[in-house]
Amino acid sequence: MMATIPVLKVIIAGDGNVGKTSLIRRYCEGKFEQSRVATIGVDFQTKLVKLDQGEVKLSIWDMAGQERFQVMREGFYRGSLAAALVYDLTEPTSLEHLVKWRKEIRKVIPDLPMVVVANKRDLAPEHPMKHGRMLADKIRTSHLATSALTGEGVADMFRHLAELAVSKRRSS
């Protein structure tokens, strides 16, 4: 009898145009598309991930960043085991808004493990990430840097999310 592969739901949240969909596509499909189409509501993809604990299937939920989708998003947070709060290194307000995103998610799942992700590293290679690190320290989580364009840090980010999700599932 084959063992069932656990499905772990994770969410990718942040303002519009920070690169959430691009990160997911880079990870799941291995590609980057220059053209941007805003996510309407939510979207999701799945990917098998091999961890030290065994294989898991990540169900990666892409949350639309526009304010008008807030009420809808809250329903989709349920059942999540981890979240990435993504900001654009070239857009400081997207980092400031992560506080709002965290609050919105915590309203639904108070103890959800999260990671702060600085995206678009390729556009700002010398940009200091101290403010992102300060936020991550303040909320007691990790801070990672990624580039959906080059792929830098993307696999590490999703592996970290998968490990957070496995840990959360075990403690629930």
Residue ranges and their predicted role:
Residues 35-44:
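Short beta-strand-centered segment that lines the nucleotide-binding/catalytic pocket of NTP-utilizing
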